[in-house]
């Protein structure tokens, strides 16, 4: 069935490992920038599909970070039939699926007629770090050079705090994107993301400063038992302070 936003959020509350990109808030963010979110629940499985309009009334469908292979398996035939029906209703010319899997071999258990896309939307690889424990325990798991740089930054007067200056964050992103050659979202995009996630305790912007001047910033988001490094930025100045 197609679920309302309220029903979808209630469904996700039973799945604490669900990816951030499957949350209702993420769907609402994308809806402000040209995508239509459709949430589908069939028994104990579900997915949020994003549709984007094309010329002549067609669309493309996209499921980012769908639930793991144990939930979306060949046994979920009714679920996939519903997905297929909804895609037809939206006149989707294709459905792009980027599942939340530990390895590509897990796709084989789905027994679906999938074709590998030559293009990724999300990064194809993700590093997962266990951050349980006290600060010293976490530091002890890092490489010696990393610990050195962290302590050097502290020694050189770099401080870190929560930040809500979205315009300054966007300016840092523009500097970083220009330097490293990647596309940066609009100011309105970051503002909307912050407005959707922050009041619910689902995101924070952290800024590293020296004498009140922003040197680097991180937009981190959280859902369930996982946090995500979404966007990071840094200035070209004071890099010797290891911000």
Model-derived features: positions:
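Divalent metal-dependent hydrolysis catalytic cores, especially in the metallo-beta-lactamase
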Residues: 91-99
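A conserved beta-strand-loop-helix scaffold within acyl/acetyltransferase catalytic domains
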Residues: 2-57, 99-104, 111, 115-241
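Glycine-rich acyl-CoA binding loop
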Residues: 76, 242-243
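Short, basic, low-complexity termini and linkers enriched in Ser/Thr/Gly/Pro
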Residues: 44-45, 66-92, 104-119
């Amino acid at each position: 069935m197609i679920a309302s936003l309220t029903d979808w959020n209630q469904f996700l509350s039973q799945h604490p490992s669900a990816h951030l990109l499957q949350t209702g808030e993420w769907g609402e963010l994308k809806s402000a920038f040209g995508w239509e979110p459709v949430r589908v629940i069939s028994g104990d499985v579900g997915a949020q599909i994003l549709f984007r309009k094309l010329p002549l009334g067609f669309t493309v469908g996209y499921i980012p970070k769908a639930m793991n292979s144990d939930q979306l398996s060949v046994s979920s035939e009714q679920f996939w039939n519903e997905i297929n029906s909804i895609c037809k209703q939206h006149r989707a010319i294709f459905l792009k699926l980027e599942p939340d899997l530990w390895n590509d071999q897990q796709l084989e258990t789905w027994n679906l007629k999938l074709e590998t896309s030559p293009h990724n939307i999300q990064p194809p690889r993700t590093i997962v770090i266990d951050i349980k424990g006290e600060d010293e325990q976490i530091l002890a798991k890092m490489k010696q050079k990393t610990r050195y740089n962290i302590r050097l930054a502290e020694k050189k007067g770099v401080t870190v705090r929560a930040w809500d200056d979205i315009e300054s964050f966007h300016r840092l992103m523009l500097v970083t994107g220009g330097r490293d050659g990647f596309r940066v979202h609009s100011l309105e995009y970051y503002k909307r993301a912050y407005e959707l996630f922050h009041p619910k305790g689902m995101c924070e912007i952290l800024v590293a400063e020296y004498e009140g001047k922003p040197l680097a910033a991180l937009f981190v988001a959280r859902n369930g038992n996982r946090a995500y490094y979404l966007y990071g930025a840094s200035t070209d100045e004071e890099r010797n302070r290891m911000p």
